[in-house]
Curated annotation (Swiss-Prot):
Belongs to the IQD family. Binds to multiple calmodulin (CaM) in the presence of Ca(2+) and CaM-like proteins. InterPro entries: IQ_motif_EF-hand-BS. It comes from the Eukaryota. Residues 18-39, 226-259 are annotated as: Disordered. This is Protein IQ-DOMAIN 10. The keyword Cytoplasm applies. Residues 61-71 are annotated as: Calmodulin-binding. The gene is IQD10. It is found in: Nucleus; Cytoplasm, Cytoskeleton.
């Protein structure tokens, strides 16, 4: 009994040793097989990490580039808006200045025109006043020195004025016809001369002789009055008045027996 138990224990120990040795061999074999697999997996993980890093870097660079591009676009838009605003301000100010300058020029022109018209009106008034004073003076002289009545003197002055107007119209008509005749006669020539043989004077000489720019003072010829026996009387205005007798009165004053 004792020997059998020892054999069994020895056999079990040998079996356990064999199992352990087999397990060690199997473990060594499996470890040898797993090492290249682990190395290949480590290399693949390194490659994936590098690819991921590259992709992340690319994405980050693209993001930064897009962000920079957006900032540049926004800056360009901002600059364009600022420039457009400044241009609009400049154009508006320029237009306002132009409008104000145009208004000032219109006011200056209107003022000049008003001053010219006022000067002409004042000149005409002065001329009319001078003419009226001259006529009144002539009327006073004729009334004081002549034997005609006031109505006769006024009628004579009116006739003279009408005669001067008719004379001016006739001269203007003659000048216009002279110009037309000479223009049709010398049509197509570079230089032409007004016919002095037919008219005597040229239209320019006639116009200068007429002197339309001067104030026309009517000249009246006072007939010589025979001195009377009565002494001359001095008026309060220091105007010497002459008394003359009419021819009818002189004839009636003579007596039928005289002579």
């Amino acid at each position: 009994m004792g020997s059998g138990w020892l054999l069994r224990s020895i056999i079990c120990l040998n079996g356990t040793k064999k199992n352990k040795s087999n397990r060690g061999n199997v473990h060594s074999e499996t470890s040898n097989r797993v090492k290249p697999v682990e190395s290949s997996s480590a290399a693949s993980t390194k490659l994936t990490v590098e690819v991921a890093v590259i992709r992340i870097q690319k994405a980050f660079r693209a993001f930064k580039a897009r962000k920079r591009l957006c900032s540049l676009k926004s800056a360009r838009r901002f600059n364009s808006l600022i420039q457009g605003h400044t241009v609009m301000n400049q154009t508006s100010t320029a237009l306002n200045v132009i409008h104000s300058w145009y208004d000032i020029q219109n006011q200056i022109r209107a003022r000049r025109l008003y001053m010219v018209t006022q000067g002409r009106l004042q000149h005409k008034r002065l001329e009319n006043r001078l003419k009226l004073e001259i006529k009144l003076h002539e009327l006073e002289v004729e009334w004081c020195g002549g034997s005609e009545t006031m109505e006769e003197i006024l009628a004579k002055i009116q006739q003279k004025e009408e005669a001067t107007v008719k004379r001016e119209r006739a001269m203007a008509y003659a000048f216009s016809h002279q110009w037309r005749a000479n223009a049709t006669q010398y049509l197509g020539q570079a230089s032409f001369n007004l016919g002095k043989e037919s008219w005597g004077w040229s239209w320019k000489e006639r116009w200068i002789a007429a002197r339309p720019w001067e104030i026309r003072a009517q000249c009246y010829v006072v007939k010589p009055i025979k001195p009377s026996k009565k002494p001359e009387k001095s008026s309060p205005n220091n105007v010497i008045t002459k008394t003359s007798a009419k021819p009818d009165e002189v004839g009636n004053s003579k007596k039928p027996g005289s002579g």
